[in-house]
Amino acid sequence: NLAVTLANMGCKVGVLDADIYGPSIPTMFDMEGARPMSVQVNGKSKMEPIENYGVKVLSIGFFTKPDQAVVWRGPMAAKALNQMIFDAAWGELDFLLIDLPPGTGDIHLSIVQSLPLTGAVVISTPQNVALADAKKGIAMFQQDSINVPVLGIVENMSYFSPAELPDNKYYIFGKKGAEYLAKDKEVPFLGGLPLVQSIREAADVGRPAVLQDQSSLAAHFD
């Protein structure tokens, strides 16, 4: 949704799905079954990212079957990631958004060593088990040897409001956990997104909720 919003604002946007072991971006962009083509750039063969909704996308999911498990050691995963970064014809971009897997590990280290990152946005649900991973992620980015600015924290699935009781909020996963974490770590709290069925359905069918006028998510990007 963030990528599509930036594209709609006139920005040149790319999305790199760095979740090597569980790629979901092809589904969310309605690109399942797509395969990148090879193009020549300055005499060299490059992968051409697949574009939809004005956003260029690359994912390991383009090269595997939907039911195929990616069982790779860290060095092989890092090599595949570097190929999608450096052996791809991204062209000129204003933003390259990188979807990282939860936690910390080889993938995260490869990214921070390969690219000069402008910043990181940490996403977490409010419950403690999720916040524990988010806290470790923040600590990783703030290490002196990595030193990537944490632009803020977003709380996903903050609360649930049933259609018949739109003014009621039910904090199924806990209340304001990510907001408290942001205060504790002295990083900005960027806001919370509610648990909304239409948002989940939009992701499953590859139609970003921000493009749907009736979506409650669209209002967050106005």
Report residues per predicted region.
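Conserved catalytic-core segment of NTP-binding enzymes
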Residues: D94-F95, P101-E201
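Loop/turn-to-beta-strand initiation segments
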Residues: Y53-K56, G91-L96, G119
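Phosphate-binding loop that captures ATP/GTP phosphates
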Residues: L6, C11-D67
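C-terminal boundary of histidine-terminating zinc-finger modules
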Residues: A203-S215
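Amphipathic alpha-helical transducer elements in NTP-driven molecular machines
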Residues: G22, G74-N82, N128-K135, I172-K175, ...
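Phosphate-binding/switch loop-helix module in NTP-utilizing enzymes
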Residues: G61-I111
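Residue-level signature of catalytic and energy-coupling elements of molecular machines
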Residues: D17, I25, L58, L81, ...
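Gly/Ala-rich phosphate-binding loop of Rossmann-like dinucleotide-binding domains
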Residues: A3, A7, V112
